[in-house]
Amino acid sequence: MMRLTIIGFGNQARAWGLNLKDSNFPVRIALRSKNASFEGATSSGLEAVEIGSSDFFQDEIFALLIPDQLHVEFLKNHGEHFRPGTTILYAHGYSLLKHQFELLYPHINHVLFAPKSIGTELRKQFLIEGKLGAVYSTEHFHGDSLLFEQWMKNFSKAIGINLGPYRTTIKNETEADLYSEQGLLCSLIPYAASEMFRGLTDKGIEPELAYFECWHELKLIVNAMVDVGPKGFFDLISPNALIGSEKGYQKLFTPAFQNNLNSLFSEIQDGSFNQEIDEANVEEIRNRIINRWKASPLQLTFEKMKQENP
């Protein structure tokens, strides 16, 4: 079995590495020599190698799991040194679609393998043998595709994927991932929950009860949705919840809401969002958002309840 060299040791890379190690799949971690994560990787029982060393380029398959915005610099520094036929896996299609690495580095096979999970959850679900999905694209792979797909099947199983992996395109994965983050996962869900919490407490509802209703139950509801599917979920809920769901659907999901969703997707497709990312001060935005949530009544209630119930 060909070894995988994982470049980086953030949340996603750490989960990949530990899952593969626990599955006895050959893997090692590649880091800069002075990277503080070097010791963390080795103390986790993973082999570590210095990026750019002669040993580093020995393997045939790599996973580039450093942040997307660092991919260009990494390949500019090291891309030409990879042997012809080397394969690099990407956990998200964004940098591939934006920078067209297949044209800049045609001697490398650029392959998408995208687990549909954040790194911490990838590790957690692996340990409890939960459901983990992934998609992949080999549209820029030019070697022995049958041999590689057999390797990827074994790799996918070893990392914990048991839903798929399903074939897609780099373009589709990138656009769907960005759209789901903007329209649902990282915006609608947390911000709607926060507004609901604020609305309940403003009307005299105890913060602890509001927390249960608007935040804690999210996980329980989503678990049920994933376990039984959309139809099964609406078969499952109580009559009050069923009638209330229809009322909320009619009042909240207006044509204006749909137009806003369409606008988000259009700005992903036409490149406007790419430009926003290029021009953004990520740290300034992150600090602003973190400070907003840090002072929110929902966060303060979460911290209070966690302290009371360690």
Predicted regions and their residues:
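NAD(P)+-binding Rossmann beta1-loop-alpha1 motif at the extreme N-terminus of oxidoreductases
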Residues: 1-49
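Short, glycine/charged-enriched secondary-structure capping and boundary segments
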Residues: 19-22, 44, 77-80, 102-106, ...
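Short, acidic/turn-prone active-site loops that include or flank metal/cofactor-
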Residues: 32-34, 52-55, 92-94, 115-118, ...
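Rossmann-like NAD(P)-binding element
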Residues: 46-91, 95-96, 105-112
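Rossmann-fold dinucleotide-binding core
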Residues: 90-179
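Active-site-proximal catalytic alpha-helix in oxidoreductases
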Residues: 149-150, 154-203, 208-226
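NAD(P)-dependent Rossmann-like dehydrogenase/reductase catalytic/cofactor-binding core
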Residues: 208-310
